[in-house]
Structure formats: C-alpha cells, structure tokens
Amino acid sequence: MRKLPRQARHRVLEITLDMSSTMHAIARECFPNAEQVIDRFHVQKLACDALQELRIEHRWEAINEETNEMENARLEGRKYRARKFRNGETRKEILFRSRLLLFKDPAAWNVKQRKRASVLFELYPDIQKAFALVQRLRRIYSSCKSVAGARLKLALWYNQVNEAGFHSFNSVAASVFAHWNRILNFSTTGVPTLPPSLLTPSSRP
C-alpha cells in the first residue's frame, strides 16, 4: 500500500473491506480520508453460516436417532425401516439435502426443493425462523438506499436475532454490533449485492 504515492492514497474516498481489525487498521493508516464500508458478502455469509450450523446440529441429532433405532430393531430381531415423509425422504436425507436450498431465495427453488423445504420447516420451525432472518438481512441490503432507512431496519433485524435466541447467531449479532457504522455505510454506496450463489461453499456437511 505504501508504494502508492501518499497524495494518491489521500484522494481515495471509499474503501470496501472485511471485518478484520487488521484490515481496518491498515485501511485507516493508508487511506485516512476514505470511508470504510464492510463488504456485505461477509455479513451475509456470517448469517448463512449460522443457519447452516443449526441445520447441521439437527442433522447429527437425526443421525444419532436413526442409529439408536437401527440398534433397537436389531436387538428386537426386526428389520429397520426409516420413516419417509411426504416428499419421499427420511429425516436424515431431508436435513442433508436441504443445504443448498437454504442458501437460495425461495423464488429460486425448484419443485423438489419447495417440497423438501415445506417438510423441513414443519419438522424444524427453528430452521424456518433462522432462514427468515437470513432472508430479511438480504432484503435490507437489496432495498435500503439511505443510512436512516438501513439503520432502522438493521436495528430491527438485530433485535429479532437476539429475541430468537439461536446460539449459532450469537457471532452474527456480535459482529453487527461491533461494526455497526461501517456496515451501515453500504447504503450510501453503489456496490452491487453479491448473488446468493456466491455464498454457497464448495463443500459442507
């Protein structure tokens, strides 16, 4: 950064970065006149990761439950058959195959994903609630055009996260609180929203 002329660095008025304290310090030192904007990708990814963590917790519960049922069936000398729900999948399969649909906007779901999501949300209302929180955050980024409007909606979202009481969302709420002003700066910039597909990791349980 210091290889850039000092005068040129001082002309930079805006810089987009992640939530790293190191990057914050570097940006402040190298671009003292630039307004810092937290890249919305990092905020949205925190929320998506928290949602997936909740799904994974339930998946392990389903795996353990199925393992116990299989063992009981073996001890009783009967054949084990896992219950299949109306979309033709077992509880464990639903939780495993729901990974990608939870990264998407519901409008982008195909028929099979819509059926799977319907069953998933009936079985796990907490996943449905967490999914709604992620979607609300995306709408804040896509709809707010002023700091005042963004502040109001983000504050409401922050309160909803706290009221939901999801352990996996604690780090999301803490990060939003810690970087509040720099997150709100997104509403004064023209940086485009990254599509949900870019939030999908290449591999995840």
Residue ranges of model-derived segments:
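Short, surface-exposed linear patches
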Residues: 36-40, 58-61, 69
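Inter-helix linker motif
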Residues: 33-49
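Acidic/histidine-rich catalytic cores and adjacent linkers
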Residues: 2-32, 45, 64-205
